[in-house]
Amino acid sequence: MTATLQRRESASLWERFCSWITSTENRLYIGWFGVLMIPTLLTATSVFIIAFVAAPPVDIDGIREPVAGSLLYGNNIISGAVIPSSAAIGIHFYPIWEAASLDEWLYNGGPYQLVVLHFLTGVACYIGREWELSYRLGMRPWISVAFTAPVAAAAAVFLVYPIGQGSFSDGMPLGISGTFNFMLVFQAEHNILMHPFHQLGVAGVFGGSLFSAMHGSLVTSSLIRETSENESANYAYKFGQEEETYNIVAAHGYFGRLIFQYASFNNSRSLHFFLGLWPVVGIWLTALSVSTMAFNLNGFNFNQSVVDSQGRVINTWADIINRANLGMEVMHERNAHNFPLDLASGESLPVALTAPAVNG
């Protein structure tokens, strides 16, 4: 009888735990996806902060020339980064227990893999948590669908691209200047500016910004006045009110006359679906462009494609881009020190001022 009561008590405790995890009454919804999301994101955040502040230099190119990325090794907020794992590791899974020592793990950039893999797991669980909360509240699932766009973009630069290129050292560094360096090298090696999916992604991001500004300004300009001139129009809105707070007919009429009639939505639901769809599809396409270029399916190359009747090349914008790509690729060459010695991190070495005599 005692054993039966203990089983019931433990089952009851488990049921209470399940109801707490899935309760929509909590201040922050946890959910079953949150059970995995919380520890993975906390781990990624903690290791990122520690590595950004104090990680020793990493041999990113596998040529015994470590690159310092942390604040304690001379960087600032702009130049600092968590340096990607060494090219000597490639795309091998490199947890702490695979290294001979902690020093070796740090030297080969182990923290980068730890941060990236935990981060991607965490944000994937965040998608699931959004869907889970929407499901329990009886909402439609489009919030989680929209969030797949930035997650796909992150997965493209942190996971798919390194896999395609054969090494985590080709992944995007976790820092500001490291991100810019990644973008310049990506352009030099893959001509991303001439990739149609990336061009559509640019249209998605900038178009989404334009549509957001247009929508916000139209709504703000057509608010239904319910306050005096001496009060803010915002005071007229009450959270949860049923009546419209702006005149969609006026906004539709204004925009239809400003451009043309059919450029303006007369359905608020289809309008907001479009506002969500446009940037999401654009970022999906950008992630797809990076994922295809990861396997060297690069942007279009129209270099020296325009010639006159004598066969002489007529330079176009494509040739200018090609020249810039070559310059960026040369500057990125491993073990080629293009910068002055006072910008280098190591000690300056003496240089011979006279050429040696060559007999013969």
UniProtKB/Swiss-Prot annotation:
It catalyses: 2 a plastoquinone + 4 hnu + 2 H2O = 2 a plastoquinol + O2. Chlorophyll a ChlzD1 binds at residue 118. Its EC number is 1.10.3.9. It comes from the Eukaryota. Pfam families: Photo_RC. Residues 345-360 form a propeptide. A quinone binds at residues 215, 264-265. The record marks 344-345 as: Cleavage. One of its GO terms (biological process) is photosynthetic electron transport in photosystem II. The record marks 190 as: Stabilizes free radical intermediate. PANTHER family: PHOTOSYSTEM II D2 PROTEIN, PHOTOSYSTEM II PROTEIN D1. 2 of the reaction center chlorophylls (ChlD1 and ChlD2) are entirely coordinated by water. Herbicides such as atrazine, BNT, diuron or ioxynil bind in the Q(B) binding site and block subsequent electron transfer. This is Photosystem II protein D1. The gene is psbA.
